[in-house]
C-alpha cells in the first residue's frame, strides 16, 4: 500500500481515485489512520515517498497528502521510518503524546506505546532533534538512543541501532533485558 504525490491510494501499484471533496467544511488535507493489530506489522509508503514499518499494537495518523509547509504524522506505538530526501527542504515532524521528533533527513525508530511510561528514539542514519515535554531539545547522531520517561529526558547513549529495528524482519533482539521487558515484547 502506498500513496502517490497527488494523495491517491496505490494498492498493488493500481491507483484508487481519491475521495472527491464537497468543498463545504472539509479539511484541505484529510487525515488517515492506520491501526496495526497485535502480532502483525505492516509497511506503508507516504505520499512524499517516505517508508514506514509499523509494529504491532501501533496507531499512525497521517495526511493523505502533506501540506506544502511541513510534513507531520502522529504515532502511538512503534515505527521505523525512512524519510525521503526528495523534499528535504520541507520539515518532517513525528509527534507522540510524550515527545516530538524533528527530522533532519534520516532513518530512525520511535517507540512510544500509550500504555508505557518509557519511550525511546533510536537513530539509524542522518540526524534528528527530539523535543521532550519540557520543551528541551536533544540532537541524535547515528547509533544513539534517547530514553524518555513520561515525556521527560532520562538518558542518551550509544547503541547498535540495528538491534532496535530487528523487529522489522520478525526478530526480537533483547540483550540483557529484564524478564518483564522480554514478556512485554513477546506479547506485542
Per-region residue spans from a language model:
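A residue-level detector for the "anchor" residue at the start of short, highly conserved motifs
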Residues: 1-188
Amino acid at each position: 500500500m502506498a500513496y502517490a504525490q497527488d494523495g491517491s491510494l496505490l494498492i498493488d501499484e493500481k491507483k484508487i481515485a481519491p475521495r472527491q471533496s464537497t468543498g463545504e467544511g472539509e479539511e484541505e488535507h484529510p487525515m488517515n489512520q492506520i491501526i496495526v493489530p497485535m502480532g502483525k506489522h505492516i509497511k506503508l509508503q507516504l505520499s512524499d515517498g517516505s517508508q514506514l514499518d509499523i509494529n504491532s499494537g501501533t496507531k499512525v495518523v497521517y495526511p493523505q497528502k502533506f501540506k506544502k509547509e511541513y510534513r507531520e504524522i502522529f504515532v502511538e506505538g512503534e515505527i521505523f521510518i525512512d524519510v525521503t530526501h526528495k523534499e528535504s527542504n520541507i520539515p518532517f515532524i513525528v509527534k507522540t503524546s510524550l515527545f516530538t521528533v524533528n527530522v533532519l533527513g534520516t532513518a530512525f525508530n520511535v517507540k512510544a506505546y500509550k500504555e508505557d511510561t518509557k519511550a525511546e528514539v533510536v537513530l539509524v542514519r542522518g540526524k534528528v532533534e527530539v523535543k521532550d515535554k519540557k520543551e528541551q531539545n536533544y540532537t541524535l547522531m547515528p547509533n544513539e538512543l534517547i530514553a524518555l520517561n513520561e515525556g521527560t529526558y532520562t538518558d542518551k547513549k550509544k547503541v547498535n541501532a540495528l538491534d532496535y529495528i530487528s523487529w522489522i524482519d520478525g526478530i526480537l533482539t533483547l540483550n540483557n533485558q529484564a524478564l518483564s521487558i522480554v514478556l512485554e515484547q513477546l506479547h506485542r
